[in-house]
Amino acid sequence: MKIHEYQAKEILRKFGVAVPRGYLAVTPLEAEGAARQLGGGISAVKAQIHAGGRGKGGGVKLARSPDEARQHAEAMLGMMLKTPQTGPDGQEVRKVYVEEGCRIARELYLGMTLDREIGRLAVMASVEGGVDIEEVAAKHPDKILREWISPLTGLMPFQARRLAFGLGLTGDSVTAFVRFATGLYNAYVATDASLAEINPLVITVGGEVLALDAKMNFDDNALYRHPDIAAMRDPDEEDPKETQAKEYDLSYIALDGDIGCMVNGAGLAMATMDVIKLSGGQPANFLDVGGGADEDKVTAAFKIILSDPHVKAVLVNIFGGIMKCDVIANGIVAAAKQVGLSIPLVVRLEGTNVELGKDILAHSELKIIPADDLGDAARKVVQAARAA
């Protein structure tokens, strides 16, 4: 689960992480009032959406007066902010965060996430702050410092100091950085976060270490332990299809292609997308119906796929173990009739009750394209999508 910048900073404050003062605003007048509460001097008006790169898209503006803060808020609120992470359609700005300005001496990067290859939490730091860390990793990997944290000891002071020295910090800034990094680590662990990222982390002219921006993501499977964080979810920032999928306990992720996929099992779903790509197509989604899906769940999954206007063809790839092929077949038929299926549908079934499932599809009066194996199914659905 993702949250907004202002929410992440609210959490980090509780763990002693230094962040500038700021106030949320949902109207231009509230933004003006927030700037006055901050003293009426220089402030930053920041669009709140679940995407990075806001500054490049016009979503972060400096205001030198409360009146200018109001003007920036008027321009931002309601706009479709486009960044490299929002896609071409952009994301509507519904709220802004007005934050006090500071005199910046240096911009750095500090982030924490799980390194799945090593199986430990990785703390990353870089002198290249304020830019996309993925770009830095690709072009200048030598500029990223890393420390791997033992779950038995946590982040050790010597590791935080080593990062500070690697960033070229000296004097009181080293002490402030160690305190900052320790607070960020404590917040990451205590909240079951999957990502905690400060970009940029700034060193002020006075030597303070501040989180000028903050991003936190959380493990959905641990949210039952954090009802306060779960309450921070913003449905307006999520794909409606993904929200609907959660209601039916479906694993759904929207992608940019035009071939809808419905598969049982995450591994088979990823393999299906790979084979579609190898066959020259582009998957429109990842959708795992799981091993214990019933007819209603399959029907819901089918409707979610077909609600995407970019989908030109659908591939259903089922290996029936716990999941029975006849259940899938009945769900496909029910959903196709309910939504009035008008695009090509390729189905590959294998496993438990496969002959019964194929018989149900054959007598459904639907124009279903059968496939014998995954390679055959991928080729047929790519061809169908191109012809649609």
From Swiss-Prot:
EC number per UniProt: 6.2.1.5
Keywords: ATP-binding, Ligase, Magnesium, Metal-binding, Nucleotide-binding, Tricarboxylic acid cycle
Entry keyword annotation includes Acetylation: no
Superkingdom classification of source: Bacteria
GO biological process: succinyl-CoA metabolic process; tricarboxylic acid cycle
Transmembrane segments: none
Cofactor: Mg(2+)
Binding site residues for Mg(2+): N199, D213
Gene3D superfamilies: ATP-grasp fold, A domain, ATP-grasp fold, B domain, Succinyl-CoA synthetase domains
GO molecular function: ATP binding; magnesium ion binding; succinate-CoA ligase (ADP-forming) activity; succinate-CoA ligase (GDP-forming) activity
Intrachain S-S bonds: none
Enzyme class: ligase
Sequence ranges assigned to domain ATP-grasp in this UniProt record: 9-244
InterPro entries assigned: ATP-grasp_succ-CoA_synth-type, ATP_grasp_subdomain_1, Succ-CoA_synthase_bsu_CS, SUCC_ACL_C, Succ_CoA_ligase-like_bsu, Succinyl-CoA_synth-like
Family: Belongs to the succinate/malate CoA ligase beta subunit family.
Listed HAMAP family: Succ_CoA_beta
Main function: Succinyl-CoA synthetase functions in the citric acid cycle (TCA), coupling the hydrolysis of succinyl-CoA to the synthesis of either ATP or GTP and thus represents the only step of substrate-level phosphorylation in the TCA. The beta subunit provides nucleotide specificity of the enzyme and binds the substrate succinate, while the binding sites for coenzyme A and phosphate are found in the alpha subunit.
NCBIfam families registered for this protein in UniProt: PRK00696.1, sucCoAbeta
Identification of the protein by name: Succinate--CoA ligase [ADP-forming] subunit beta
Record lineage: Bacteria, Pseudomonadati, Myxococcota, Myxococcia, Myxococcales
